[in-house]
Amino acid sequence: MKLSLLRHGEPVGGRIYRGNQDDPLTEKGWQQMLDATQNQSWDLIITSPLLRCQSFAQHLHQQQKSSLEIVDNFLELGFGDWQGQSSMQIGQDLVDAFKLSPIENKPPNAEDLYDFQHRVLNAFKIITAKKSNSALIIAHAGVIRVIKSYLLNLPIEKMFTIDVLSASCEEFEI
């Protein structure tokens, strides 16, 4: 199966720890995603239910006439008390500590990283068991980091060493 992982484009509200906050894409975010998927097609499109992913997935689904699945387990990591705040509001030292050691330094009231990994990979394994020639997962940086960590055999504690830019699209053969 050809598997593509696409992070959503720029959302309304700027660079914050958004988590499950349901912000739509900006015009720039839409254009980023159009550019990232230009001249490509997939048999199956899988998306997070959040607007910044699902709205574009619906558009692509209608355009390509491909199958579409909305997967709740592809929601972004819940950032607890950090949700809706920028790195500057949180404190760069706390953000750096979290990225370096996310198990020991998780944000207050945040989702457990192992629970997050478990829910994402459960959904991912169901998807990869499907008989599809090509699939596109439209999701969030955290979800994509978990999947890439799994595919690259990296421990989940190292997921923040993986860069996932807005509207970046990577392809894997699985």
What are these regions (language model features)?
Residues 24, 62-121:
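Phosphate-handling substructures
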Residues 141-145, 168:
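GST superfamily/GST-like fold recognition
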Residues 2-64:
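Active-site-proximal alpha-helix that buttresses catalytic centers in soluble enzyme cores
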